[in-house]
């Protein structure tokens, strides 16, 4: 194989901090299941890209998720490859009796990833679908409204869970994290850099 066929896999330092924290707080069987779910999810993204004939340039694991950088994709192919991660991961649920921990991790990860908030997979699919709209301003406004609605709903749910179920402040961090991430990464519907998360 030539130099051109290699894919760079990068693991950023924040990932090691997350792993160390999880090993201190969670049984190792759950940690292994969680990271297996992440790897499976990314493998389904990679498999769909390869099946559609695209070259994967880099796979980057970060503390806030993983990112696959590929050669530029057509919009429809980008939608298919983005949706392949959560949909493929959900196929693992067919084996839930044999792998209950992995199935729980896959279900939680897929549900979270399908939220229509960019840069999650659901938000990427929504952006891809709305990129077909003629009016880019209307598409961007619709995306912003959907994201704010979902994050607001999550925030109210997290606050209720925190007080009613006495879960502490931790559930509120998820919508706050999403809110910060969407504000930092706002991009127009017109795609110039084709990436699949």
For each feature predicted by the language model, list its residue ranges.
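Hydrophobic transmembrane alpha-helices and their immediate loop junctions
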Residues: 1-197
